[in-house]
Every structure is written in structure tokens, then in C-alpha cells.
Design a protein with these regions (language model features):
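A glycine-rich (often HGG/GG-containing) alpha/beta subdomain
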Residues: 1-146, 150, 154, 331
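Short alpha-helix of the ABC ATPase nucleotide-binding domain corresponding to the H-loop/switch region
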Residues: 278, 286-290, 318
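Switch I (G2) and immediately adjacent beta-strands of P-loop GTPase domains
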Residues: 53-64, 69-73, 253-281, 299
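Conserved catalytic network of the ASCE P-loop NTPase/AAA+ motor domain
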Residues: 12, 62, 76, 126, ...
Length: 453
């Protein structure tokens, strides 16, 4: 038996529609004490998932809103329990009054993520689907939303479950051979087992290979802005951000630390990192900033080398350019096209050279095109992209264990030795979907949700 929980699913801000979400045994009957149908019939008389008009009352029995509600009976609901939703006008006062009336009717306040936790515990979804709910809420681009929606529908589980189930069958056979040596069981087939485990390892490798693209879709392409002082790095960040994110002055060395800002560039989510201008300096604080600029290149996806095109290249420009070319991808941005250009593009060893004016905004369509070419949309965002670090870690551990099992087979070791590695692989892979559940992991996952989800 589960207790009755309630929450404002849409937050307490003033909105067009506000939703009270309910779940638990007996919640439909209890909700009927607070929401009365216009028909005069009890709320429990409604068929599942059919909206009906009614009135919401506060704890003193006073009407506070004319709204709609629907019910879903177990097990055909989000949580797998009896559930109800009351859809009001988005008045914080009305929603709060309705919630307090529900508490008086025997409900308690839902904890963060409790509706989705109940869905997981009741078998309505696995952990990958639960985590994808958060990703879908947080998605900032169409690609991120599409990938998260695919995972909510079970895309990762559909890849993991066949591998896990195959390992279960192998383990069962190994145990049968070991536990019943006198029975007429098929003999230990080295080549058959090795082929099966090797194939599953390849499938895990393919899934892990999608991590890099998945991270960029979900969290953004990390683009580090490099250049000498006063080349226009901070002005570039402000232009792409659409507001003055950082201070811009004519004084060299104004930016002394890295500054991050997430922006949308066409279909791309981009995490811009503005850095201190690269130059030799005696200022201790600025020197630390320059060192951080050099460090930022090491884990970026692309470096944006910004240079003032109205002046000849300096030694400081060349030092920044060399740092940018250490990145996996690099784009040269010839800034200040509103002035007379003096730099020859042939002097810059970049595949992508974009002339722009951060002052008036010209050339930024070309920068977007460069991102399209560097980061093509060549992988379908259907849920198959692995975006979650926890899941990737568990899959990597599973792959290492199954690879160890293959090596044991090739070395001619006995089935019990192979079983140790294979069962370790199963434990790790089971963590991905929650088959092998660790409470500390699930607590951490659902704590990330807001109340009402």
C-alpha cells in the first residue's frame, strides 16, 4: 500500500494553467472531497483519462476555482498507482489553497522526483527512462529534446536488455554445467561462448562511441575563445549571448579569468568559454588567467581564435593561434571588419576563417555555417545517443568485465573463472537500467527532480 501524495506540478509562479498532481492508493476517492464534478457525480465515476469540469474547494469548503480534472487507475498510469490531476487557472493562491485542502483530505507533500520514483519502483519505467525525463525537461535544443524523448520511450533499454538477457542465459548454462556434472547438458562450447561475448562487447563499444556526440547534444559544444588582449574575445561572447555578459574596455587584461555562457548557434547548443588574453605579463592574477586559458583548450571541442583584422599579426596573436591549433577543431575569426582589413587569410593555417564584426554583427551567419560543417547532424537524435555519465560509466565497467571473460575463455580457464567476470559484467550493466539497484544511486537520481515530477 502506498500513501497519498500531492504536489503543484507547475510551480507556484503565475501561469495560464496550474496543475495539482496526485498519486497513491485511494487518491481518487480522497481527491473527490476537494474537487466536485459539475455533474454532481463522484470523481471516481469518471472513465480513465477523460477531462471533466468541476469546482476546486479549499480546506474550509469555499470554492476557489472552476477547473478540470481527470483520473487514471492503476496500473495504467504514470506512477502505476491510482492518480489524478486537477488543472486550474495558474493562480498561486488558488493552487496553494487546493494543495492545503488535499493535505486536509489525507494527502502529504510529494518529495522531489517522487512521482517518477514510484513509476520506477512500480515497473512503469527503468532508470534510463527516469533520467531521460530530467533531460527532456532541461533540453535546450530540438536535437536534445528529440534524443531525450527517444530515451523516455526506452531507446537505451532496448539496446541494453538483449545483451543482459543473453548473459543471463550464458550464466545459467555455466551454472548448470558446474552444479550438475552428471546430467546430460551440452558441453562447454568455447567458440560459441566466445563469439557471443565478443559480439556483446562490440555492441557496448558502439553505444559508448555515441557518448561524445551525445554530450554535445545534451550539454553543448564546448568552444573556447582565444586571442591576444583586446582582439574582441569578450565582445564576441557578448554578441553571441545577446547581452553584455562580460565587461568590455579598451584596457588590455580586463578579462582575467574564464567566463562561461551557454548560447544557441543555429541548431547547436554551445558552451562558450571566454578567456584571458594570451600575452606575457608580470601581473600575478592576469598570469593565472593566461594559464587557465591554455588549460581550457585541453578539454574543449573547438577553439575560436579571435584576431583584430585591422592590425598586423603580433607575437601575442601567434602565441594564441598556436594554442588554438592544439584543439580538436579550430576556427579563425577575423574581427573588426567594420575597419580596414590588413591580415592575409593565407597567413592563418586554419580550415575555417570567418570575417566578422562583433560591433555590427556581420559575418555571424558564416560562423553558424562553420559549426554546421564541423559538427554535422549525421547521427539521428532518436534516443540512441548516450548522454548520461552514470550510464556510460556502468557500461564501460560492464565492457571491461566481459572483455576479461573473453580473455579467460581464450586462456582455457574453467567455467567458474569465466563466471566471476560475467557476473561482474551483469552487475554493472544492470545498474544502467536499475535491474541491479543501488539505493544510493537511485536516491541521487531522483533528488535531481523538482517537486511534482
Amino acid at each position: 500500500m502506498s500513501d497519498k501524495i500531492a504536489a503543484i506540478a507547475t510551480g507556484r509562479a503565475r501561469t495560464g494553467i496550474g496543475i495539482l498532481r496526485l498519486s497513491g492508493d485511494g487518491c481518487i476517492e480522497a481527491a473527490g472531497q476537494v474537487f466536485k464534478l459539475n455533474s454532481g457525480k463522484p470523481l471516481s465515476s469518471l472513465p480513465d483519462r477523460k477531462l471533466a469540469l468541476g469546482t476546486l474547494f479549499d480546506a474550509q469548503g469555499r470554492p476557489v476555482d472552476h477547473c478540470m480534472a481527470f483520473i487514471s487507475r492503476a496500473p495504467h498510469s504514470y506512477t502505476g498507482e491510482d492518480t489524478a490531476e486537477i488543472q486550474c487557472h495558474g493562480s498561486p493562491a488558488a493552487l496553494t489553497a487546493g494543495l492545503e485542502a488535499l493535505f486536509a483530505a489525507g494527502f502529504r507533500q510529494a518529495r522531489p522526483g517522487e512521482f517518477t520514483r514510484r513509476a520506477f519502483l512500480n515497473g512503469q519505467m527503468d532508470l534510463t527512462q527516469a533520467e531521460a525525463v530530467i533531460d527532456l525537461i532541461d533540453a535546450e535544443t530540438a536535437d536534445a529534446a528529440a534524443n531525450a524523448a527517444g530515451q523516455v520511450a526506452g531507446a537505451i533499454r532496448k539496446k541494453i536488455d538483449p545483451i543482459y538477457d543473453g548473459w543471463v542465459d550464458l550464466c545459467a548454462h555455466f551454472h548448470a554445467v558446474l552444479d550438475y556434472p552428471d546430467e546430460d547438458i551440452d558441453p562447454f562450447s568455447l567458440s560459441g561462448y566466445e563469439a557471443s561475448l565478443t559480439d556483446s562487447s562490440r555492441q557496448l563499444t558502439a553505444l559508448l562511441a555515441s557518448c561524445h556526440r551525445g554530450r554535445m547534444v545534451q550539454s553543448g559544444i564546448k568552444a573556447v575563445i582565444l586571442g591576444s588582449p583586446n582582439a574582441g574575445k569578450s565582445t564576441l561572447l557578448n554578441r553571441l549571448s545577446g547581452f553584455d555578459r562580460v565587461i568590455v574596455t579598451d584596457i588590455p587584461g580586463t578579462t582575467r579569468d574564464t567566463v562561461e555562457q551557454t548560447v544557441t548557434l543555429g541548431r547547436h547548443l554551445v558552451r562558450l568559454v571566454d578567456t584571458a588574453g594570451i600575452r606575457d605579463t608580470q601581473d600575478v592574477i592576469e598570469k593565472i588567467g593566461v594559464d587557465r586559458s591554455m588549460e581550457a583548450v585541453k578539454d574543449c571541442d573547438v577553439a575560436l581564435f579571435v584576431v583584430d583584422d585591422s592590425k598586423p599579426l603580433t607575437d601575442e596573436d601567434r602565441r594564441a593561434m598556436d594554442a588554438a591549433l592544439e584543439a580538436p577543431e579550430a576556427i579563425a575569426i577575423l574581427n573588426k571588419q567594420d575597419l580596414a582589413a590588413v591580415i592575409e587569410p593565407s597567413d592563418l593555417p586554419f580550415s575555417y576563417i570567418i570575417p566578422v564584426s562583433c560591433k555590427d554583427g556581420t559575418g555571424f551567419d558564416l560562423l553558424e555555417q562553420a559549426f554546421d560543417m564541423l559538427f554535422p547532424d549525421d547521427t539521428p537524435c532518436d534516443g540512441s545517443l548516450l548522454t548520461n555519465a552514470r550510464q556510460a560509466d556502468a557500461i564501460l565497467r560492464a565492457k571491461k568485465s566481459v572483455d576479461s571473460a573473453v580473455r579467460s575463455l581464450r586462456a582455457g580457464m574453467t567455467p567458474d573463472a569465466v563466471l566471476v567476470d560475467l557476473e561482474a559484467a551483469m552487475d554493472a550493466l544492470g545498474e544502467v537500467t536499475g535491474r541491479t539497484m543501488r539505493e544510493d544511486i537511485t536516491n541521487r537520481i531522483f533528488e535531481r527532480f523538482c517537486v511534482g515530477k
